[in-house]
Amino acid sequence: MTVTAAMVKELREKTGAGMMDCKKALAETNGDMEAAIDWLRAKGIAKADKKSGRTAAEGLIGIASSGTKAVVVEINSETDFVARNDAFQELVRGVANVALGTDGSVAAVSKATYPATGKSVEDTIKDAIATIGENMTLRRSALLEVEDGVVATYVHNAAGEGIGKLGVLVALKSTGDKEALNAIGRQVAMHVAATNPLAVRSSEIDPAVAERERNVFIEQSRASGKPDNIIEKMVDGRMRKFFEEVALLSQAFVMNPDQTVEAAIKEAEKSVGAPIEVAGIARLLLGEGVEKEESDFAAEVAAAAKG
């Protein structure tokens, strides 16, 4: 397969690797972008695929909650100017509230009736496009619900009540005190916003993702020239660390790095007065997974921290 300049540029943007390294990686992997990323990582040239950290679209994340049930939605716009528009912000809040009465899927939310217009959410968004003069789309939504307990919420970079650039839901099952439960739930939600875990528990991580990491670690370890039995132990150790870093419960708690999230939740059971189980998490970052070259979420966060 012919390696084009556009392919090299895309790989450079995703990995930060040099142009010649990117060209070689693509040649070695027959133009397979994901395989080329792994090839660069195995050679120690790139740490990881950066694409998940790049902001790709404007708009807002909206959250609505009823205590034991909460939903997070993403509505994209073309410009940040529209995202600051009062009418657009009200639309995002309204769609989130409508979504709370559905199963949380984009299809169900789109077909649901928007009370203020009497039309479907889909048609209401179309009307807003005509009024505001910019394309908009309901891109993603997620819903969590528990029978006993709470679904805690957190909005980062809030533009107003329940709307912002990043939204998190954390479902906690417990028969204990709701106020205390919501307090630890909000802390865990803030932690999820900061660390973006792949799953609640290591056993829930996609086997394909784990296998991909193992293969990269194997290639990296082989470069040491050590015997296979030593390499196997090295890889096993790195996989244990990988699971600890990407599974929520085993991560160091952002609020207190001296304990894990699991330990923090266990400690909170004293004030809650009952056992707590993390039943699920949902995290939506605006524009995640759809790249936009001129905007880098990591750079925005760094700039905000300095300002």
UniProtKB/Swiss-Prot annotation:
What main location does UniProt list?
A: cytoplasm
Q: Tell me which positions the record assigns to the signal sequence.
A: none
The record's listing under InterPro entries reads: EF-Ts_dimer_sf, Transl_elong_EFTs/EF1B, Transl_elong_EFTs/EF1B_dimer, Transl_elong_Ts_CS, UBA-like_sf
> Which UniProt keywords are given for this protein, alphabetically ordered?
Cytoplasm, Elongation factor, Protein biosynthesis
Q: Where in the cell is it found?
A: Cytoplasm
Top-level taxonomic group? Bacteria
Known Pfam families for this protein? EF_TS
Q: Which GO terms describe its molecular function?
A: translation elongation factor activity
Spell out the GO cellular component terms annotated for this protein, sorted alphabetically and separated by semicolons.
cytoplasm
CDD domains tied to this protein: UBA_EF-Ts
Tell me the function of this protein.
Answer: Associates with the EF-Tu.GDP complex and induces the exchange of GDP to GTP. It remains bound to the aminoacyl-tRNA.EF-Tu.GTP complex up to the GTP hydrolysis stage on the ribosome.
Q: Which NCBIfam families match?
A: tsf (TIGR00116)
**Protein name as catalogued:** Elongation factor Ts
Q: Look up and give the organism this protein is from.
A: Rhizobium meliloti (strain 1021)
Q: What is the lineage of its organism?
A: Bacteria, Pseudomonadati, Pseudomonadota, Alphaproteobacteria, Hyphomicrobiales
